[in-house]
Amino acid sequence: MGNIHIQTKSKEYDVYVGKESLSHLTTIVQNMQPSVSNIMIISDEAVASLHLQTVVDALQIDQKVFSFVVPSGEKEKSFENFYAAHTSALENKLDRNSLIVALGGGMIGDLAGFVAASFMRGIRFVQVPTTLLAHDSAVGGKVAINHPLGKNMIGAFHQPEAVVYHTPFLQSLPEKEWRSGYAEVIKHALIGDVKLYHWLKEEVQTLADLRDEKLIHILTKAIPVKANIVAQDETEKGVRAHLNFGHTLGHALEKELGYGNITHGDGVAVGMLFAIFLSEQVYKVNLAYEEMKQWFLKYGYPKMPSDLSVERLVGLMKQDKKANAGTIHMVLMQEYGVVNVVSIPDETVHIALEAFQKDMVEK
């Protein structure tokens, strides 16, 4: 098992990664000061049916434990479920010394974290991720719900007390969720650990390789990339924006195709390829785009859909949180491991996106 220490200006906490990580949960709760009054577990239907009772049984405590379960899917990261969770919290007499446990993937981590950030102006919470994708979202304290006009537009920065990454929970994931989460692993390698990138190319030939000791190795390498960036810039005023590599187009694809119709990781994978495609033009460098594209396709990541309106996608990219005064800001790559946030004119993005779309269709 590997423990990773996270240090930000507002809080320090640990990420427990391994096959026995859940055994730490009771100790984490018992060591909290002031002592925890009661616990609300927030989960979704798919995860709850598999793992909720396991977590309840692992909590060897005297305090009341209850659950709030929402339907599964990104579209459930909504104001309606956020409001309903507050209602449940009030009905079950949560107070400022209560604890919320987020049991699920990134959607649940975001929703439960935002409930924790806002209930009585902020209470404690613990992340118990059940997906590979959540190795990114569970660390760093960004919590949010979606708005019909954009993803993660209503939210806060609220760090967890701990992250308990019990890897056996991931074994029930369908292949599309392994692929989705692996995109964020690739992102962390490309922007912050080139050695990990080369290791992935050698050791992860198929998604089936993302298991057991290799999985633990990947998590203990990818999470510190994010941790190091968050330590420098907790509230995304500077270098934390680098973590959005691939997300400008990725989020636009999610919005245009409809939340749930493309996984977050599939969107980010296409977005990273476009960022590399555009980076080669902007920086006049060779980033081996063609080789990268074939590597991505090998894992089953989608191509850029040929029937999408480039004009509509550019409009959605202008709504991205990095955008400033209606100007698109993208994270571009100078070389592997070196990225920057760059202001890009609409026309440049439009021309490049048309060329990228054509390239993805023809080859």
Curated annotation (Swiss-Prot):
Binding site for Zn(2+): E184, H247, H264
Compartments it resides in: Cytoplasm
Assigned EC number: 4.2.3.4
Pfam family, one: DHQS_C
SUPFAM superfamilies listed in its UniProt record: Dehydroquinate synthase-like (SSF56796)
Keyword Hydrolase appears in the UniProt entry: no
Keywords carried by this UniProt record: Amino-acid biosynthesis, Aromatic amino acid biosynthesis, Cobalt, Cytoplasm, Lyase, Metal-binding, NAD, Nucleotide-binding, Zinc
Annotated pathway: Metabolic intermediate biosynthesis; chorismate biosynthesis; chorismate from D-erythrose 4-phosphate and phosphoenolpyruvate: step 2/7
Binding site for NAD(+): S72, G73, E74, K75, E76, K77, T130, T131, K142, K151
Keyword DNA-binding: no
GO biological process, one term: chorismate biosynthetic process
InterPro entries per UniProt: Dehydroquinate_synthase, DHQ_synth_AroB, DHQ_synth_fam, DHQS/DOIS_N, DHQS_C
Gene3D superfamilies in the cross-refs: 3.40.50.1970, Dehydroquinate synthase-like - alpha domain
Annotated catalysed reactions: 7-phospho-2-dehydro-3-deoxy-D-arabino-heptonate = 3-dehydroquinate + phosphate
Cofactor binding remark: Binds 1 divalent metal cation per subunit. Can use either Co(2+) or Zn(2+).
Coiled-coil annotated residue ranges, if any: none
Molecular function per GO: 3-dehydroquinate synthase activity; metal ion binding; nucleotide binding
One GO cellular component term noted in the UniProt record for this chain: cytoplasm
Function text: Catalyzes the conversion of 3-deoxy-D-arabino-heptulosonate 7-phosphate (DAHP) to dehydroquinate (DHQ).
Record-linked NCBIfam families: aroB
The family this protein is said to belong to: Belongs to the sugar phosphate cyclases superfamily. Dehydroquinate synthase family.
Protein name: 3-dehydroquinate synthase
